[in-house]
């Protein structure tokens, strides 16, 4: 799955907004006219056909004025009386250039919008392909990253050094005693008991004195030299 950073997501949103704006404004504004009202885009052909139809249909001369018909019988007809009925108004002659201009502007706007949309789509596809390729880059087989090798070496060195200095970091470890204390509250008051145990013995809640089984621990130390009983005998008396 492709992953995007915050900057790439912001750029994608901005690019998408530009594409939407280009789609909305692809048709553009109609060409402005000087001296007359603007004709809506796409209505030029309809208006021209209406003018031609209106010019071709004219009422008979007899219905306009009976006196004019009588005068026309007596006088020869002139070209000025027939030409207005055969040709459309002067404004219709101006329509083809306006129609051509509107179509040219419309075509230019659509072509520009299409090119802009194609550029935006190419940019989006490039961003998506780069995002997919970025996180999947792996080192060639047979070569391990430098960080992994150094990490492995440092781990091995720590393990090896730990073996030699496991008991203590500053001085060699020697078997000895550990002083333990027990405090209890009774009706007679507070009772305190203290004794020594070998360093290997476990620490438990109940007071217990452990003897040495391996012979490596001394029977007494400077802390328990004055105790009454040692190792395996009765529990030391309270003092």
UniProtKB/Swiss-Prot annotation:
Region (Disordered) location: 47-111, 127-184
Family label: Belongs to the paramyxoviruses V protein family.
Lineage of source species: Viruses, Riboviria, Orthornavirae, Negarnaviricota, Haploviricotina
Listed name of the protein: Protein V
Gene Ontology biological process: symbiont-mediated suppression of host apoptosis; symbiont-mediated suppression of host cytoplasmic pattern recognition receptor signaling pathway via inhibition of MDA-5 activity; symbiont-mediated suppression of host JAK-STAT cascade via inhibition of STAT1 activity
Keyword rRNA-binding tagged: no
GO MF assignments: metal ion binding
UniProt keyword Zinc present: yes
Additional information: The protein V from strain B1 contains one putative zinc-binding domain on its C-terminal region whereas protein V from wild-type avulavirus strains possess two.
Residue stretches of biased makeup (Basic and acidic residues): 65-74
Residues bound to Zn(2+) 2: 212, 214
Residues that hold Zn(2+) 1 according to the record: 177, 196, 221, 224
Domain of life of the native organism: Viruses
């Amino acid at each position: 799955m492709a992953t995007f950073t915050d900057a790439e997501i912001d750029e994608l949103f901005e690019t998408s907004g530009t594409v939407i704006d280009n789609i909305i404004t692809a048709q553009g504004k109609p060409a402005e006219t000087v001296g007359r009202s603007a004709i809506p885009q796409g209505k030029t052909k309809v208006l021209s056909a209406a003018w031609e139809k209106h010019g071709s249909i004219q009422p008979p001369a007899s219905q306009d004025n009976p006196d004019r018909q009588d005068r026309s019988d007596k006088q020869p007809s002139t070209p000025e009386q027939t030409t207005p009925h055969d040709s459309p108004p002067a404004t219709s002659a101006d329509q083809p250039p306006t129609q051509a201009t509107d179509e040219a502007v419309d075509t230019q706007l659509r072509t520009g919008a299409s090119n802009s949309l194609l550029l935006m789509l190419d940019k989006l596809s490039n961003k998506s392909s780069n995002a997919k390729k970025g996180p999947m880059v792996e080192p060639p087989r047979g070569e391990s990253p430098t960080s992994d090798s150094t990490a492995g070496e440092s781990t091995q060195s720590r393990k090896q050094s730990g073996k030699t200095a496991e008991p203590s970091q500053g001085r060699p470890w020697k078997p000895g005693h550990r002083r333990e204390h027990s405090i209890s509250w009774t009706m007679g008051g507070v009772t305190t008991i203290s004794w020594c145990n070998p360093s290997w013995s476990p620490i438990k809640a109940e007071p217990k004195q452990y003897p040495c089984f391996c012979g490596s621990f001394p029977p007494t130390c400077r802390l328990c030299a004055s105790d009454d009983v040692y190792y395996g005998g009765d529990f030391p008396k309270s003092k």
